[in-house]
Amino acid sequence: MSILFDSNETIYPFPPKPRPLSAEAKQHYRSRIKTLLRERNAVMVAHYYTDPEIQALAEETGGCVADSLEMARFGSTHSASTLLVAGVRFMGETAKILNPEKTILMPTLEAECSLDLGCPVDEFSRFCDEHPDRMVVVYANTSAAVKARADWVVTSSIAVELIEHLDSLGEKIIWAPDRHLGSYVQKQTGADVLCWQGACIVHDEFKTQALKRMKILYPDAAILVHPESPQSVVEMADAVGSTSQLIQAAKTLPQRELIVATDRGIFYKMQQACPEKTLLEAPTAGEGATCRSCAHCPWMAMNGLEAIANGLEQGGRAHEIHVDAALREGALIPLNRMLDFAASLKLRVKGNA
């Protein structure tokens, strides 16, 4: 069973686009960032959806480019005393929850996520209280307060496996906040899932009819889709998965052309994984009134070179993540469950190899 919680659709105001930098300015900030990372004993942790030059800098300086699960793992095991998280705010909060002794800096604390914004803790807590017989599973794209209200935190890379596990134990589920991913895992597992009505502003814009027209132009291309996309788009896919799973699919699929329905920031690592293949952006209807994000998260785009340099140099209120101690303790429980479950999955996969 899958029921959608009926909340009002919200149009979120987007941040202004970062000012473009000259080649000389970019080189200045890259050099400054490298120096500041050394001086602060810091390491960069960047998400796949940040701009290519940010991902390249993270790699060049010994940092990490990954999905949110691997970002969490990397930050927990690295020896640096400071983590510079290039992503959105919930990623910085997660890093602080898992590493309270470390300084967590972000280029800006105003980098939001529509899934986080669409799941306010007071409203969500009331919803959970109305269904006390259900296990509460929340996506990593949520605030520390929402995580603290949950029994489990999950990323898209292990969502199906976790819901299968809970279903095998006879659990009924509350899933939040992404309605498309919740619907996808329900269909994959047959579990009893009650979905909160949230959506990613990037993936929600992929259009079935436009994708069909693109497939006519590229009939031999494979279609890769993130499960935060609408069901009708997911049903057209040759491969469905998280960011890391889509990169792996790009490597292993035989097709030489790939239509990719996720944030175009992923193209940097995906092209590294299969340089011989042609990557094509799935249509969102193009620039203009019919698309707002146009396949790139506007908050991820806030993680520019200038902002990163400022974050490392200035720190303080505008850049440092703090999480209340009691809230951290509450959120750490479901986060550790996620990490332990993910580790057990890896062991099981190795055991079956």
Curated annotation (Swiss-Prot):
Predominant location: cytoplasm
Keyword Glycosyltransferase included in the entry's annotation: no
Lineage: Bacteria, Pseudomonadati, Pseudomonadota, Gammaproteobacteria, Enterobacterales
Known role: Catalyzes the condensation of iminoaspartate with dihydroxyacetone phosphate to form quinolinate.
One Pfam family in the UniProt entry: NadA
Subcellular location: Cytoplasm
Reactions this protein catalyses: iminosuccinate + dihydroxyacetone phosphate = quinolinate + phosphate + 2 H2O + H(+)
Source organism superkingdom: Bacteria
Record-given protein name: Quinolinate synthase
Gene Ontology biological process terms from the UniProt entry: 'de novo' NAD biosynthetic process from L-aspartate
Record's cofactor remark: Binds 1 [4Fe-4S] cluster per subunit.
